[in-house]
Amino acid sequence: MKITQLETLRLGEFPNILWVRLHTDEGLVGLGETFMGAQAVEAYLHEWAAPRLMGQDPLAIEARARDLTGYLGWRGSGVETRGNSALDIALWDLFGQAANMPVHTALGGKSRDSIRVYNTCAGYQYIRSNVNQSSSNWGLGNPSGPYEDLQGFLHHADELALSLLSEGITGMKIWPFDIAAEQSHGQYISAQDLDSALEPFRKIRQAVGDKMDIMVEFHSLWRLPMARKISRALQEFDTFWHEDAIRIDSLDLLKQYAEDCRALICASETLSYKWGFKDYLQTG
């Protein structure tokens, strides 16, 4: 089997998403995807990646990954990495089709029959534009349907928690601190802004008690001093995890943050490649 074509698809309705289709001479087509900076990633794929993939064996996935890793730009999570990630997904999709089995089976099989679900409280228009990752791109103000959960957690988190529980969902992730972080570049949060951001947590606990686990997303917007202050303020609400509370340019800072955080810590969304995860895990 040989790769014959690299096709990319971008939809005007979802300009942040790029779909990648790898065609083969046997008629199989592998599907991959990536998010953010779609136009730049698309250009990289056609300029750099496609010439290195044409005529190659798609089932030799490690060899294809080696061929796509150059000397510049492959340590962080920028355009090259996101493009290669989409290709990796497409290659594994081809592998599963060729083997006539789900990829998870080829990799050793499932370890459980079900997994708990939590709700990321976003809305229909959330980060749909490719402008930026900020509150200005949340798509608030014009609900597009009944499940506008971002507006829900900001203004009636109690009702949202009750609605989720009624559907058997016992975890919800919210990010009420982002607006304050954007105002100060993560360097300061006033007592008033802190109190306002804590209001959704109060409403959830008053409405459903401890029946709902609350996960907190910070989008890597805070500097360490304010992140620690917020973490201490959240202790009374027994939050389940804190996700990307600070930029982890320095993993030592994450370890300092953990000293004030009773919740579990999630911090892998901005990492890339196995080396980034290795360094992260070694922090303990």
Give, region by region, the residue ranges found by the protein language model.
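Metal-dependent enolase-superfamily TIM-barrel catalytic cores that perform enediolate-based chemistry
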Residues: 114, 119-256, 260
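Hydrophobic alpha-helical hairpins/lids featuring a short glycine-rich hinge
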Residues: 78-114, 122, 128-131
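Active-site phosphate/pyrophosphate- and oxyanion-stabilizing loops and adjacent acidic/basic residues
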Residues: 93, 105, 202, 255, ...
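Short, Gly/Pro- and small/polar-rich lid/capping loops
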Residues: 1-21
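Conserved, mostly hydrophobic/aromatic
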Residues: 3, 27, 49, 87, ...
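Short clusters of small/polar residues that mark proteolytic maturation junctions
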Residues: 8, 33-34, 122
